[in-house]
């Protein structure tokens, strides 16, 4: 099994940036999101172990405080692209040392986190009679899926 010990400090930092970067892509997709979406990202970390079976790698990821890349981009679109790049880099690092099964578990974890963030608030006027996930959030999740490929 692959664990934190198998990666350099820089590689591990990149792996830790992947999940919150995916969550931020979803938050940015719909005019900045909400506090509820931000909290849903934190909740996803605590629920991850129950949903993804045994994985020392995910145990190590979940055990650490989520890392956020503090880079500042000019526009929301640039920030979104920067965070999608973080997701791509994280999966690329994992592919070099983790098993295929562990890479797939990480993908499912990141995608599950993004989906929880998207479902955190109901769309529509005052949250009434709206959808749980907006079209913009669905598009963001599709982009995250592509980045994880």
Predicted regions and their residues:
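Small-residue-enriched hydrophobic alpha-helices in membranes
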Residues: 1-149
